[in-house]
Amino acid sequence: MEFGPRALGNRSIIGNPMLEDTRQRINSTVKRRPSYQPFCPSILEEERERLFKDSFSHKHMAIAFRMKKQHIKNLPCAVHVDGTARPQFVEEQDNPNYYRYLKELKNIMGYGVSLNTSFNLHGRTIVRTPQDAVVDFIDCNLDELFIEGYRVRRSS
């Protein structure tokens, strides 16, 4: 389990950083905060030099790096208004399941990047137990919940 102020892929709300409405949807329906407030991306370590100028490996979303201009338009929800992002660079040994998820995104979208924010609703603490996760999932507008090897989907 992570500790500290950042969700690092285990207790996270994740989303497609290529879709412009991802940030708006999470900010308005889950986090209930201003639409301009940014999220941090989780990125495959091997994508770091392709996507960022003057970056170094960093795993905790605490340092902002300037994204290369040619990628900003393709990843609008992964970058702040000033062209920077506070990424979590993920290596396989750090979190094998999350790494595989990012590798699959790269195969599908061409980018090993996911929007990542802590799994907590406005005014609540980050989920700590499976029960917390289910309660918050029921109380918000997320599509799916992946928990301990299970996939839970909302009924249509």
Located regions from the model:
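Flexible beta->alpha loop and helix N-cap segments adjacent to enzyme active/binding sites
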Residues: M1-S156
